[in-house]
């Protein structure tokens, strides 16, 4: 054990001597060292302590400010997102005080829900309100399951949001408007959203007093998943949209482009 520990200390000091910025090899090695071993390295080579801190992705507080709009592809793994009027931050999961025991659906769970959606129209009615009964948008959704999957995943962490579908460049896109300026998105929720978002740009923005998730389609990927769009369309057309939801759509038309 003593020999192995010595070898790892030498390897750590060798990597820390390099002047290159953060790299995966350094991080993997530093994570494999115990606190006692790291302390030994820093005791022998005090100048390496600063290098070690510089190569960390997040500050020692476990928090890092983000710029709005924020592209979710820039999200650090194992970090949550905290947005509020006071700060917009990525927060290390180990330092997060807002994560509860919420069960986040996986990408596979969301796809199963998409395939079974005709049997659960009322359960997911908020999603269908977002089409505003526009037939062409409803039919486009049959080729883009990603939008439903993202809605389904987000439904596990929030209820005070409104999806809005719109067409741009012959592709279906979605805004998700959170009717609040305070929002916590757990890291697992972000991971699952990014898993289903191939071919999409997903951005977080703040407009007026709302947080808005932009789900913008770049390319439509071929899917073998089929749903009976005629049955779904009929059910959506028969659905009553509450006046409150209709009023919100009218207000958002003055804020959001393309709708």
Swiss-Prot record:
Post-translational modifications reported in the UniProt record: Phosphorylated at serine residues in the N-terminus. This phosphorylation regulates the localization within the inner nuclear membrane.
Name its cellular compartments. Host nucleus inner membrane
Q: Transmembrane residues, as ranges? A: none
Q: Name one GO cellular component term.
A: host cell nuclear inner membrane
Q: Which GO terms describe its biological process?
A: viral budding from nuclear membrane
**What species is this protein from?**
Human herpesvirus 7 (strain JI)
Keyword NADP applies: no
**Which protein, by its recorded name, is this?**
Nuclear egress protein 1
What the record says about family reads: Belongs to the herpesviridae NEC1 protein family.
One Gene Ontology term of the molecular function aspect: zinc ion binding
Q: Gene name on record?
A: NEC1
Q: Which controlled-vocabulary keywords does the entry list?
A: Host membrane, Host nucleus, Membrane, Metal-binding, Phosphoprotein, Zinc, Zinc-finger
**Function, as annotated:** Plays an essential role in virion nuclear egress, the first step of virion release from infected cell. Within the host nucleus, NEC1 interacts with the newly formed capsid through the vertexes and directs it to the inner nuclear membrane by associating with NEC2. Induces the budding of the capsid at the inner nuclear membrane as well as its envelopment into the perinuclear space.
Q: Tell me how this protein assembles.
A: Forms a heterohexameric complex with NEC2. Interacts with capsid vertex specific component 2/CVC2; this interaction directs the capsid to the host inner nuclear membrane to initiate budding.
Q: Which InterPro entries match?
A: Herpes_UL31
Q: Where are the zinc fingers (CCCH-type)?
A: 80-184
